[in-house]
Amino acid sequence: MMTTTVDQTAIDPITFEVLRNGLDAIADEMAYTLVRSARSTMIKDCMVYSAALCTASGDLIAQAVNFPVMLCSTPDALYIVADKFRDNLAPGDCIILSDPYEGGSHLPDIFMFTP
């Protein structure tokens, strides 16, 4: 019988908070950039958008402080994109997805993913 051990390195609370707040700040900057460059009144005035950082496997690691309900369909959309483009993505690529049958909840949902 084979046993495996998992090396769980503990992280001190201060380092954890510094990293967590840094990731949250990145997500917030993504959201602010979207608002500053948007032409849609739904984004600029109604603030109906979300921004988040996810792992390559689709797990959420940080989200901007805005409309979090939009993040509910993000993992499904990310899985679709990862499945179709996983082997062909390079730094600088941006995949735009607007398909209610492929992860979005309705047609106006637009997802942008970058590796």
Where on the chain are the PLM-derived regions?
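Glycine/proline-enriched, intrinsically flexible loops and inter-domain linkers
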Residues: M2-P91, I96-P115
